[in-house]
Amino acid sequence: MSESVDSVELFTDGACKGNPGPGGWGALLVCKGVEKELWGGEANTTNNRMELLGAIRGLEALKRPCEVLLVTDSQYVMKGINEWMANWKKRGWKTAAKEPVKNADLWKALDEQVNRHKVTWKWVRGHIGHHGNERADQLANRGVDEVRGYKQS
């Protein structure tokens, strides 16, 4: 009997105070009604790097290949994965202007994770009350706060 593939919803977000500055990423995984919260941060980063890390860390947390609905409010992540990445790879991680792709280290890591799973991408507008997106935003801000030395109670 073949093992069934789990369906997972993954809500991701990034936050940065200063851009560049202290930043955080958040990921909320939902599988079979169970939620898992992930977050982290870096002292000197950008919002785009944190958006990417939210997606990467969420996908990395999955122990085996899954069907993933990845929900983000980041146009940067959506356009990168759906429009730009194929050409970046063809050009050896260069832009159309022959410049190195910004955040190529993270785009490569995301590409590796996406290839482990069957990912469907969904963009949602941020800060309009979407439960999963709001939780991911709170987690990303927790990551910022921890980097800045604030503790959550």
Swiss-Prot record:
Query: Where on this chain does Mg(2+) 2 bind?
Result: 13, 137
Keywords (alphabetical) are: Cytoplasm, Endonuclease, Hydrolase, Magnesium, Metal-binding, Nuclease
Superkingdom of origin: Bacteria
Q: What is its EC number?
A: 3.1.26.4
Q: Where is the signal peptide?
A: none
For the biological process aspect of GO, one term held by this record is:
DNA replication, removal of RNA primer
Name the catalysed reactions. Answer: Endonucleolytic cleavage to 5'-phosphomonoester
Q: Where in the cell is it found?
A: Cytoplasm
The protein's matches in Pfam families, at most eight in alphabetical order, are given as: RNase_H
Nucleotide-binding as a keyword of this entry, yes or no, is no
Keyword Hydrolase tagged? yes
| InterPro entries from the UniProt entry | RNase_H (IPR050092), RNaseH-like_sf (IPR012337), RNaseH_domain (IPR002156), RNaseH_sf (IPR036397), RNaseHI (IPR022892)
RNase H type-1 domain ranges (all copies): 4-145
Cofactor(s) the protein requires to work: Mg(2+)
**Family matches, as SUPFAM superfamilies:** Ribonuclease H-like
Q: Which NCBIfam families match?
A: PRK00203.1
| Family the entry assigns | Belongs to the RNase H family.
Purpose of the protein: Endonuclease that specifically degrades the RNA of RNA-DNA hybrids.
Record protein name field: Ribonuclease H
* Organism whose genome encodes this protein: Pseudomonas fluorescens (strain Pf0-1)
Task: Give the gene that encodes this protein.
Answer: rnhA
